[in-house]
């Protein structure tokens, strides 16, 4: 009985400790294929290494939220940090600017990462 109580106590303690972990997200913005003006492609925003799991990810075109953005299932690493992929179909042009905006409790303000076309 005492052993069972100790095991339950350790499990609860580990859950509480996990909730105390705070890690800011790492953000990468890239396309599925090399970009060509006027040719359909996919814009991806890969957000990783964050905790807790509550997060908001938006893809932006010229500063405005894009429609039809899909999210992968929330997944986690061995260290309990989380990762998520937001993506949408888009047709790049030379004049349009694309970015990913991430809102998370570890950030004082949303993190905006611009898509660097030449990367």
Curated annotation (Swiss-Prot):
Disulphide-bridged cysteine pairs: 45-100
This protein's UniProt keywords: Disulfide bond, Immunity, Immunoglobulin domain, MHC I, Secreted, Signal
Signal peptide extent: 1-20
Matches recorded under SMART domains: IGc1
GO molecular function: protein homodimerization activity; structural molecule activity
Record carries keyword Ribonucleoprotein: no
Any GO BP annotation: sensory perception of smell
Domain Ig-like C1-type: 25-114
GO cellular component terms, semicolon-separated: cytosol; external side of plasma membrane; extracellular region; Golgi apparatus; HFE-transferrin receptor complex; MHC class I peptide loading complex; MHC class I protein complex
Subcellular location: Secreted
Predominant place of localization: secreted
SUPFAM superfamilies: Immunoglobulin
Entry keyword Methyltransferase: no
The family this protein is said to belong to: Belongs to the beta-2-microglobulin family.
Quaternary organization: Heterodimer of an alpha chain and a beta chain. Beta-2-microglobulin is the beta-chain of major histocompatibility complex class I molecules.
Function: Component of the class I major histocompatibility complex (MHC). Involved in the presentation of peptide antigens to the immune system.
Protein known as: Beta-2-microglobulin
Organism encoding this protein: Cricetulus griseus
